[in-house]
Amino acid sequence: MMKLIVTAIIFFMYSVVGFAQNWTIDGVVLDKKSNKPVEFATVILGNTEQWAVADANGKFVIKNVPSGNNVIKVSCLGYVTDEKEIIISRNITGYKAYIVEDNLTLNTVVVTAKENENSASTARTIDRTTLDHVQMLNVSDISGLLPGGTTGKPDLTDKNRFSIRTGSANEAGNPSFGTAVEVDGARLSSNASFSETKGVTTNNLSTSNVESIEVISGIPSVEYGDVGSGIVKISTKKGKTPYMVTFSSNPNTKQVSASKGFGIGKKAAVLNASVEYTKAIKNTMSPYTSYDRKQISLTYSDLFNNGGLTDKPLRLTVGLSGNLGGRDSKADPDALAGTWVKDKDNSLRANMSLNWLLSKPWITGIDLNASIVYGDKQSRERKHYSNTSSVASLHGRNEGYFVAQDYDGTDNQDIVLVPQGYSYNVMGIDDKPLTYKVGLKANWATHFGKVNNKVKLGVDWNSDKNFGTGAFTEDLATAPSFRLYDYSAQPAMNNGAVYLEDNVLIPIGKTRLNIIAGLRGEGTFINGSEYGNTYSLSPRVSAKYVVLSGKNRRNKVVRYLSFRGGYGVAVKQPPFAILYPIPSYFDIKVFNPTSTSGTAYYGYYIMPKNTLYNEDLVWQRNKQAELGMEINLAGNRISLVGYYTRTENAFEVDKSYDKFSYNYTDQTALASCGIPAANRVYSMDGKTGVVTVSDKTGVLPSEVINGKKREALTTNYYANNCGSPSNRYGLEWVIDFARIKPINTEIRLDGSFYGYKYVDYSMVEYSPTTQLMSDGTPYKYIGHYVGKSGIANGAESKRINANLTITTHIPSVRMIVSMKVEASLMRYHRYLSEGVDGAQRTYATSSSSGWLPADDPSFMDRRVLTVTYPEYYSTYDNPDELIPFKEKFLWASKNNPKLYGDLSNLCHRTVYDYYFAKDYISPYFSANFSVTKEIGDIASISFYANNFFRNLGQVYSTKTKQYSSLSSYLPAFYYGMTVRLKF
């Protein structure tokens, strides 16, 4: 044993000594056309993650480079990245890297999403050339460039979001909420939202300053947390550039922008500045509802490589971006005079990254990243109110009996009596979310013989907080009912994580195997909350096996072949809408006597219902697996990937019910009162609700009115996890045919199959508290349903989309023309209703007015009316006893008409016979046309026309057996143009 330990130590020391025998690479980066040096070019050694930045003379030096095979990548803003394989066995001096300017004079130009061929997971990149060609005005528009993606009409007046490998927004599992969005490493988060469980909106992100967008739809690195389905990484321009001015226009949106990358002094420092103004209108026929985006961005980059940092360079990048804007309908003459809606969409985003290249045997480099994102999303609406009589406006937040009073000028009245007449009032919600994140990561790249190994170890900390005050009014005297709920009083949600990942590349003969495996451990800490601390682990692994590759296969039929696969777990933190839902209030009018003087008197019982703490709440979890392959057949590149995603413990808010009683005094209780109606003065006890009538003349003694005790159910809301998972699966394909050289044309065929199925088998409660029992008292039964209280408790859908893109590039005239045909080949949806273990919860019924099952209760494959029953029901007197519903309901239909009528309020029936029918929409097509023309090096013009065939046909639905307009599925014909000037 001792010999084994000594041998291991000697081997380790030998390895370290071997690492010390490193080399130096120095060279120069040159413009291939002019042979002039390219300043600020970044040189990266891919296998060892070492880097350098070219100086004013284009020179660079990378020291302490270990022996072995490596890949040298040279990139610079405005140039095409150059990548070459090199063998390092000695010092390399005078290395010359020639890079070419990225413009339309190149023989090959790509205007589609490019596959990341070196990744073991599915990732695609959209570069600036592609973004210019499609004239992106909202970053979410790039979804149409993904396999099977469809082009939508740009509309900044609506909220735009990313949603990767998902279907409609109505699907279970909060699909868009799981898609992470980052801008230069700054995470945009919607965790601090109190209103919804959805992903971040992208309307306030500048598009003119974007250099590239990477979409990771496969298994992400463990470096990324708080994610569910996909990551979108947006990179802005960094580097020296000429002045650039852009003008974009389409019928609904106008944009103007200007940018410049300045070199600062003799240092390797650059300041990128960008300004943009975008204005969009909702409807050209009524151009008054609009959205404005006024943005300025600054990015400072610097390199410190002098003195003690000569061999250990330090690169600093600091970014600051601000946006002022939002939605406004104030000028709309079609709206009621004096009414308007204003929604702010202001933001301030700052980010910093520090990359320190150490090139030590035990560590390659350290990265420090920090970001903060602050938003001001205040919404205000001015509405017109018309009251034919006095109305009660409730604002109380304490339990008890309260009487409406005339406004006394203070802000602490429980019920304000709003007088009759007309009034205007401004109501709003003050919403100011803030997210900050700090991360520290250590990288170690080394090799063991021919095996390359890269390890990353990191920690990060992020926090979400909302500094808004919630709902408010500008005039409490005329405001409708609302309650104060201070967002800023709720605790911040903090999350800390540590992760470790190993990326190993193993040559196996002429093949190679790349394995990436990592583990992320997270803890969520919510001080001052009952949820306290929560912990989770997220393992992820991806692998890629390259079977055939290399330059020697250029003349072979099979030139490249690889297989890849992966599995990963990702955990999503909850939004504040789940952790701290806005409290609800049960307001019951308990006394409202008639008055001979016309003065209204309202007595209310207020019961606040704060959200219940759920000790069993866990964080939403996504489990994802994918298998893919890439093959090059005689120059035709084919990519195929299948995936499966399972969302577990999706966040939702559920209900439970409590029984309570209150004192109710109606008009009949005053019949025995001896005080004349004209002389009555009413008062109500705040604790008991007992009404006392006094004689305002003082002649008669006061009388206590005996009210009635009423029993009712009240609703409790609580954060919960969906008890059933949602499943998504699909297939994506991309076929890039070999370029047709005589006409310099490329053809791409891409598409996707997407499937979704979800059935909720968890037990939920529902009671129609607004209904009355047959005796006129509040409703007292609670239904316990499988999945949902509605007709269906699940759904399934399938889609097949295919796109054909033909791109012709004419380098001699610097022009590129593309046409894309988008086809929906299959669009299927169906509602489902399933009980636990095959039990039935929905039944065919023979009558549109009846609640009883038909003789043949089957329904899924028939066009019949249906009725849905709860599995059980419980009563006010014994809420813990679960009574089988169907058995009791059928018995009551024959033996107890009163019970039958009361229980029927828990049933749900369809009003048409095709609710559960399969819905196949017939195929439909659309065509888009785009052209970009460069005018020398000083200008370029792009034009597009989407749905330019103006396809206004109809589609057939197998569910309704009717035709409907394509306008519900395709955007109307629209067009746009962009002019870019460079000087």
What residue ranges belong to the model's regions?
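Short strand-turn segments of transmembrane beta-barrel domains in outer membranes
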Residues: 203, 212-219, 231-262, 275-279, ...
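Gram-negative outer-membrane beta-barrel transporters
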Residues: 508-513, 663-845
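Extracytoplasmic beta-strand/coil segments of soluble accessory domains associated
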Residues: 140-187
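C-terminal beta-signal and adjacent terminal beta-strands/loops
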Residues: 647-649, 664, 822-911, 921-924, ...
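N-terminal periplasmic accessory domains that precede
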Residues: 93-98, 139-142, 161-163, 182, ...
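Short acidic/polar hinge/loop motifs at secondary-structure boundaries
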Residues: 186-217
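Short, acidic, small-residue-rich periplasmic hinge/interaction motif at the N-terminus
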Residues: 28-34, 41-46, 73-79, 89-132
